């Protein structure tokens, strides 16, 4: 008998096992929306390393579950050290102010 983890448990596990997690549409190599592409570019510009990505288009339960988990309605979503940072617009603002680089120890 296989025990299924519920979606929120899967998300908690992904966030706890990776220092940086980006929930996005598509992959870093082939983003499927402009906001996800922008998020990847911002992380690259910050010098973020070992970024785990989750393609929400591959799993409907994760796509809806991450929105419920964060209480944030849009994708992409960035988590750093277990904390929800925000989406592409917030990432851009934080990058421009230098705050995002500090999260990665790159300031």
Residue ranges: model-predicted function:
Residues 7-9:
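Eukaryotic intrinsically disordered and solvent-exposed regulatory patches
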Residues 48-63:
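Thiol-based oxidoreductase modules, predominantly thioredoxin-like and allied folds used
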Residues 68-74:
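Thiol/disulfide oxidoreductase modules built on the thioredoxin-like
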Residues 80-107:
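Non-catalytic, surface beta->alpha helical segment in thiol-disulfide oxidoreductase systems
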């Amino acid at each position: 008998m296989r025990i299924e983890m519920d979606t929120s448990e899967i998300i908690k596990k992904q966030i706890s096992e990776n220092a940086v997690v980006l929930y996005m549409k598509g992959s870093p190599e082939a983003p499927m929306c402009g906001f996800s592409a922008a998020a990847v570019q911002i992380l690259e510009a910050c010098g973020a390393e070992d970024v785990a990505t989750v393609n929400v288009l591959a799993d409907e339960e994760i796509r809806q579950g991450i929105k419920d988990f964060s209480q944030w309605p849009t994708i992409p979503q960035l988590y750093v050290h277990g904390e929800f940072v925000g989406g592409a617009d917030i990432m851009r603002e934080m990058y421009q102010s230098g705050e995002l680089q500090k999260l990665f120890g790159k300031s």
